[in-house]
């Protein structure tokens, strides 16, 4: 499979995006398709958000330091230092419960992007966006091992980044829900994710090392990240519907 350069990509590939999203909706665990959609539709997004980052004092300092977050987020000794109740401790628990890892996302992204390790500001910003995805799961309360949780965070991310690929995935998931029993609850939860992303502070300018020391609930308040109430309601409705189904017995 040919790799794609995020630096050279300037046009959107709608055909490729439709193929990838069809595969993704059939198998929400196929993370490779997410990166294909981003490569197809997010042309110029990293450059635009990098310019926004360096336009702020704190963002300029982060860009100047150019820390590779994957090296921090895969360092067990570094993660072990954070006290219970902090963002860092919550992220550590997230990794333990899900079995996910930052270097797992890194490996998948390198299957698609030829320049993910390139020493270029836009490529660095793209890597940073990749590496903070699971941190945003922790901050927002949208579960990563749940298809609806991913869709809600994707909608949140679209509001934060304006990356068309994120919006395309969220919209596709919402349209698919029209054929599902709990479809209305799913669509409301996705809309809530987008609304929360718009209302929250711009998270890209957060210093992750400082954020990880902060108590999780205090960080949510400071960043104006509201509780995912409609998402929780949709989860409960799905669980209730599942438990009310008659059990099938073997013939």
Task: Please name every model-derived segment.
Residues 2-46:
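Leu/Val/Ala/Ile-rich N-terminal alpha-helices, chiefly Sec-type signal peptides and the beginnings
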Residues 185-251:
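C-terminal structured domains
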Residues 28, 57, 147, 227-228, ...:
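Proline-rich intrinsically disordered, low-complexity coils
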Residues 35-213:
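Core of folded catalytic or high-affinity ligand/protein-binding domains
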